[in-house]
Amino acid sequence: FNLPSPLEKLELSTFGVKQKVYVKRDDLIHPIVSGNKWRKLNFNFRFYHNNNYSGVISMGGAFSSHIQSLSFICCQKNIPCVIFIRGQKPKILNDILKQCEINNTKLIFLSKSDYSNNIAIQEICMKNWPNYYFIPEGGSNRYGIEGCQEIINEIDMEFDEIFCEVGTGTTLAGLASSCDKNKKVRGVVVLKGAENISNQVEKNYINLFNRPLNNNVQYLHQYHFGGYAKHSMELINFIRVFYKETGIKTDPIYSCLLYTSPSPRDQ
């Protein structure tokens, strides 16, 4: 693992950006367990090893990088792994699901209604795997947040604002809770119609840490390009130009939306 990840200055004058912009290259941490996936899983596995668990259970979508990372780590550490997958099992597995099976991960496919039934899933886990450690979807628990706090701890320079993508809000909570209160954290929400995400993140943080999250967060809802994982030729062209100018690969679901947000360009 390449830690701490490098902090690189970006030359974005081509895009009309005049301010100094730096990017924390968590995409270089590991070829598979990269980005915030390692951040959110690292402390969870520390907790797992410090307790007498016999396996790991989690959840995710069929294209989730969380399940890909979790399956890989469990395989490397010889930890039994069970993952509930949202949606019916496809006739042809995608590359992520194929790799999970190669890693000897047990995949259980659930309908969307069954997948959202938390009580039923808890009962299944307790009945079949009572001594397995449960990691929420995306690693969105206390240890996931604490892992993301390490991002700020690795930055030894002053900055005015920090931007991140927002899915579950775990990374944003980690950043906001470890920043000085005078530093602004802006979250680019990747889901359409997720206006309640701020309340969810705040409520979850209070439940986990018994204190409110720093009041230094702004959620940006207008950069999802029509909804989660949706994209246009405009977005694809931006990805190509951005890679040509910076050498940084982005994806149309998360990281690209971060760079198409107003960020320093319009601030």
Give, region by region, the residue ranges found by the protein language model.
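Small/polar-residue-rich loop-to-helix segments that shape phosphate-bearing ligand pockets
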Residues: K89-M157, Q218-N237
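Active-site/ligand-binding loops adjacent to catalytic centers
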Residues: R186-S255
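Positively charged, low-complexity intrinsically disordered leader regions
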Residues: F1-G55
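Active-site cofactor/substrate anionic-group-binding motifs, chiefly glycine-
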Residues: R39-R86
